[in-house]
Amino acid sequence: MNYGKEWAWMDNLENNNMGNKKWWIPGNVPSSKNGRRWTGKYFIASKAVMTYRKATKDIYAEYTEEFKKELENHELPVKISFEFVRGSRHKFDYLNPAQTVQDDMVKYGWIEDDNAEFIIPAFEQYTYNKENPGVWIEILSK
């Protein structure tokens, strides 16, 4: 699973009607909480999370500076919207895949931390697209 140039059909950075920029991260976002594995010493991420992170690391890295530049226009804590496009119709909790995305946003320097002093997460209604799952990330004005 590699989300490279074959995702060129969708512009990763898009402007919506309100003028806010949106960033597209392809791939069905797994829960970093569910499915953790015990090694005997500590927990490690599930295979699904490890596969997702390997497939999306270049995309997160590519948009780091652009996201940080946009973030400078907002006061902390910033309201960030997550719109999940699910690849299956399985039930899910918004918070679990959002935690995966927020962890990656911290890892790649999009945000300093994902605690309440830095981010107020918001959610749009999820949609379903078996061929093109992913998540839209948008910085909202307060």
Cite the ranges covered by each PLM segment:
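Acidic, proline/glycine-enriched N-terminal capping motif
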Residues: N2-K142
